Swiss-Prot record:
Tissue specificity: Eye.
Protein name from the UniProt record: Prostaglandin F2-alpha receptor
This protein's encoding gene: PTGFR
Disulfide bond positions: 108-186
Membrane topology: Multi-pass membrane protein
Assembly description: Isoform 1 can form heterodimers with isoform 5 (and probably other isoforms).
Keyword Methyltransferase: no
Matches recorded under InterPro entries: GPCR_Rhodpsn, GPCR_Rhodpsn_7TM, PglndnF_rcpt, Prostanoid_rcpt
Amino acid sequence: MSMNNSKQLVSPAAALLSNTTCQTENRLSVFFSVIFMTVGILSNSLAIAILMKAYQRFRQKSKASFLLLASGLVITDFFGHLINGAIAVFVYASDKEWIRFDQSNVLCSIFGICMVFSGLCPLLLGSVMAIERCIGVTKPIFHSTKITSKHVKMMLSGVCLFAVFIALLPILGHRDYKIQASRTWCFYNTEDIKDWEDRFYLLLFSFLGLLALGVSLLCNAITGITLLRVKFKSQQHRQGRSHHLEMVIQLLAIMCVSCICWSPFLVTMANIGINGNHSLETCETTLFALRMATWNQILDPWVYILLRKAVLKNLYKLASQCCGVHVISLHIWELSSIKNSLKVAAISESPVAEKSAST
């Protein structure tokens, strides 16, 4: 009997109750959690409505692919806010007494799986969007003829399934997700790293996240350079790149938001995976980095809400009036058909165009 009682005391929740040095103000945290969850859900709902309307409106194959991937990213952010936010509010409302409402560690495991999935999936989708746009700009004929909506849906499903697999890895390896030191969220084991497997999960998550950011940076750089080269090579075919310009601006904004919000958390997890977690300072740094990462799911939808063609046109007009400088003609924002885009692509990629440009 005494052995059974001692085993019951060493539950995942109880083990952390004796070492809770990283605390948060409960009332304030409940208030901010509710506000964050509400703002995130409303923002993502508005972005989903805008993207779905745009997907129905535009029948350009290149733009439809981008909008489909963007919709997947925003929907992932929406459910991440809904599920993770609801669990976080419940935890705060229960005074963070995990041992009282989650003795079997089921809720913590669900929380941890959702945290990993909703963190990794948008990063991977952002890199896939950057690759798709890079192919669409550098190889537009191949993109228009070979990459169909069916292929894009398969890529979207593949990314989601891969993120689910990574999130389920600890469960498949008979490892539990752990309550973190602040007792407000669950993730991989960061407190008492025992062996290589604990380090592996942390390093794998960090590596995949940083790799996704690196791929996005590289592909967006190639896309931007290609658009600039085409611009200087053939001034008369500007209108064929208007939809490219809008999507590239959105991609750059998504990449900047992801880098700023996710880099601290990914680097912190990598550091814990390599060096371990031995200080209160590491706990506070992790909590700050987590809050930064949470902002990513709030800011992502506003990229599609604010950086639409109509809004960009108005911003351009306002900037032109204030500065008195016309960098580009306003007709670059006018809608162009896929026929014009393919025409520009054919001209810019043909040997004749190269020859005429050189002369």
